[in-house]
C-alpha cells in the first residue's frame, strides 16, 4: 500500500514537472518567435534609413533638430535604448548625426557614425523630439556647445554610465529649448 502511494506520488510529481517544463519551453519559444525574422548578427543587422527624417535637400532653408531612440542590440534591447541627435542648419543639405558609441573608445562621441534615421542594428528608431524653423539655428549652436562640453567624451560604461543616454541627457540639460528630459 505504502509502495503504491510513493509510486503514485513520484508519477504525479514527474508529470507536473514535465508539464511545467513543457509550459516554460512553450513560453520561451513564443517570446523568441516574436524575434524570429531577426536572424542577423550585429555585423549583418540592417542599418538602412527608417524613412523618418525629412528630406534635407527639399528643406534646405529650414533648420531642423531631431532626437531619436532605438532599442539596443541583443538581450539588452529589453531594458536599454540608444539615443542620438541629428541637426541641420538653415542652408545645409545634409544632417549631422551625433551619438556616443562605446566600441569607438576612446573617442566615444561620434559624428555621422550612421545614417541620420538609420536602424540601430536592426531596430527601428522612434522620433522623440522634432524642432524646425525659427530659433532652431540658435538651438543648434547651443547643442554643438553642449557636445563640446560633454565631460565623458573618452569614457563609456554600459551600466551605470556614462553612455549614450548620459550624452543626450547632458545635451538636454544644457539646451532647455530642446525640451528633452532624459535620466542620466
Model-derived features: positions:
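Activation targets extended, charge/polar-rich intrinsically disordered C-terminal tails
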Residues: 3-50, 145-184
